[in-house]
């Protein structure tokens, strides 16, 4: 693991009060103790709120920011860029952009990316659109913005196109499997082994993306690992017994299969 993101989508930032979010930044900084970089999400509808979170993150000792498009507002490419640049001016920290049109309704388009080239702080992008053509475009046209996989079932393709980071919620409870795929593809360049590992991971990815149960699955995955992450924030509800059984079975099978592929115990 090379870093920890606080207040991302999986962290349920959208269901927390401002006070809770700022407390979480500071608490995570205390626990991480500079062992790995801490990146803090600034997501909010209002630019002013995102700026406030960015400044609080810097005060907490964050090493970088995660900057997404404002939800619901449906801003243009120019407006997204102005939003991100305002956050950048306020905090002056390295920033990973977060493109997630499935939740935010808009893409960070070429106009956005071109305008953000005004600041060297925009050094990476977590691409979660699911559109493989955007992966091609980012790798080809914006090589100065490091490509990070934000769509788990496309991890192999991201690595093939040069991505050297993967922001993956499943790694919270199954780090060994995710690291095995990352190591095989991004470090060793062994895509033959990577395809085998990816094939073993796809059932888990299908369970996580079954619709409306992503956060609940992550939290229960942590419970299976002996970590109490608490219930999901309302309106979300915990998994039912059958969902829990299915998740546990899929994780067990995945770990056993990947262990056989890599020769390392999980």
Regions found by a protein language model. Name each.
Residues 28, 57, 87, 125, ...:
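Conserved, mostly hydrophobic/aromatic
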Residues 89-90, 101-202, 206-209:
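Catalytic alpha/beta core domains of metabolic enzymes, predominantly
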Residues 1-105, 261:
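Active-site beta->alpha loop and helix N-cap motifs at the rims of alpha/beta catalytic domains
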Residues 1, 160-163, 170, 174-266:
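C-terminal alpha-helical cap/extension of soluble enzyme domains
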Residues 21, 25, 50, 84, ...:
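A general structural signal for well-ordered alpha-helical segments in protein cores
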